[in-house]
Amino acid sequence: MLAAAIELVVIATSCMVRDAHGHDYRAALAMSLLYFEGQRSGRLPPAQRVQWRADSALADGADHRVPDLASPPSSNVSVCARTDAMQCDMQVDLTGGYYDSGDNVKFGFPMAFTVAALSWSVVEYGDRLDAAGELGHALDAVRWGADYLTRAHASAGGGEALYVQVGDGDSDHSCWQRPENMDTPRTAYMVNASSPGSDIAAETAAALASAADANFSSTLLLHAKQLFEFAKNHRGLYHNSVPSAAKFYASSGDEDELLWAAAWLYIATGGEEEYSAYIAGATNVGGVRSMFSWDDKFVGAQALLVLQGKLPADGSHAEMKTNLEQFICNLVQHSGGNGGGGGGARLSPGGMLWWDSWNNMQYVTLASLVLAVHADHLTAARSASLQCGGGASRSPAQLTAFVRSQVDYILGSNPETMSYMVGYGSRYPAEVHHRAASLPSIKSSPAKVTCKGGFDYLNKGSPDPNVIAGAIVGGPDADDRYDDSRQNFRQAEPSTVTVAPIVGILARLLPS
């Protein structure tokens, strides 16, 4: 059944668009959006295409209550034990959203960043997505995440409170169960005025502002504005308020998220003074960064604001432009082979940008999106090239060619001759570190898989019974070697953060 489903996706892309290596970007684009349907939590919609998944986590938030919106939100507790209907009559709904990778926790920090990266793909390349027949699926993917984030804010009472996580990483990782009938704790965690999380509040503001720009939703924009104010007024890292998150998605600071959120709000509001003033007054615009990631958004903020071209050409804006250009130059200037560009990345012998042994592909796709949009910015601005140090320069065409090389590597033009996008091509990872994919579908095998019994499937050493099509695994090591083992979570686990930017990149590489 699954192979047939994948075949249908490929057939649906009626015009095959292949590059010099024979890669079909249209099919890869379709699969990348299919992946998000495989990551859905909550009650699945009638149009759900990934049929081996089923409804899951339908009681998320049900054990929580918050004060009625007519009353001031509590800033002290997240679980209401009172029975007074006037003070505690709103049951929390935290269903929906995405599982971030191969486990069953809903981590708000990477989920919000995923929504922002997906929205950026739509904002930049919506016309190309539409021409490929995938704009509707892309907007559905954005909306599924944005709707959850909106509920996480509204269910917390709105204003200065936000639910930021459902589930506990330690208890989840002690079990190997499919999401449809997991029995691990579904604890919900909140930040508020007394237990702040300015980083995650600002990131959620960025997600909703970017989604508002992609979906033209005034409701999303209102929540984004409220969350930005919350973030500015109550500074503090969210993992200090929610220690359960610290081991998995700890934050290194909040200034990048605040600048990133201000940039998206500036765009979504058409340049409202509040956000341009915040940007102009920012004392830390990041310098030259080593990467763009779920924890470090300075590069994204710099790119967004340079793309606008409407801010003053001096002060912090000029600094951001210089920093962004140096980041890009560091990536594309190499001494060949194993030579290192600056900025913390180097090229593997096979030509892959390489930062880290754990899910390196997330950095590859995010950096590639920045390069793609900047190349288009140079073209639109009629700039002949990007000037790098030592008199070197890179034309928009050269930047785009570099992006293409990274995408082609992911799709199979690499020393392993393996596609790191699951389901694409004739050879791709068979043992993905992903609970739902590795366990029998509840539809074909409804018998419960116990917490510890599931580890038999983790350790089985056989192909996944369900192909999580469109997922991009963590990828090979610095020498282009990949170990296709489900236990190899550093290389074999996919994430929504990795796939979100490639949606835009693949759309960009399609002919206009």
Swiss-Prot record:
Stored Pfam families: Glyco_hydro_9 (PF00759)
Glycosylation sites: N76, N192, N215
Subcellular location: Secreted
Gene3D superfamilies, per the entry: 1.50.10.10
Main location, first listed in the record: secreted
Alphabetized InterPro entries for the sequence: 6-hairpin_glycosidase_sf (IPR008928), 6hp_glycosidase-like_sf (IPR012341), Glyco_hydro_9 (IPR001701), Glyco_hydro_9_His_AS (IPR018221)
Keyword Transmembrane helix applies: no
Protein name: Endoglucanase 14
Example GO BP: cellulose catabolic process
Family (UniProt): Belongs to the glycosyl hydrolase 9 (cellulase E) family.
Enzyme class: hydrolase
Record keywords: Carbohydrate metabolism, Cell wall biogenesis/degradation, Cellulose degradation, Glycoprotein, Glycosidase, Hydrolase, Polysaccharide degradation, Secreted, Signal
Residues spanning the signal sequence: 1-22
The organism of origin for this protein: Oryza sativa subsp. japonica (Rice)
